[in-house]
Amino acid sequence: KDSLVNQLSDYFAPYNGQNQSEQVAAVIVPHAGYVYSGSVAAAAFARINPESRFEHIFLIGPSHHVYMDGASANDRFLYYRTPLGKVPVDVNLCRKLMTDCSYITCNPAAHTEEHCLEVQLPFIQYWFKNTAPIVPIIIGTQSLPVIEKIAKALAPYFNEKNLFVISSDF
């Protein structure tokens, strides 16, 4: 735990005292190994006021192991655990998204070996004073019509109450 905290502290150090905004609705962050992408992820999160009190943090990333004709919202875990502690999952909101959009299901295999969301969690835990429940979503398709339907289901939540963290390979 101490090693991770020290590493995160080093990544965030250049941004201490910089202007932050509570108006940030979304960040796009890389999910490579921390040695390659940690400073970039910290730069993105550091633009957000650490005192922000989001209702939810939507974590969205690509599937690296499982193809799906849509997305998987993980309603099988009550929380994710990192060396910094537990991050709660809003399983009820995950289930609501599945009810609202036929292209959002729960495919446990999509989350089992996936790293793109988990690598963001320590940054969230370290930076924010209050960690909001997460809504973990793995995207398994690049079909534009399907992505548009998923986006339509997520659109009501894209507001000042929530933060969207898009985990990317680039």
Model-found features: residue ranges?
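Active-site histidine-anchored catalytic micro-motif
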Residues: K1-F170
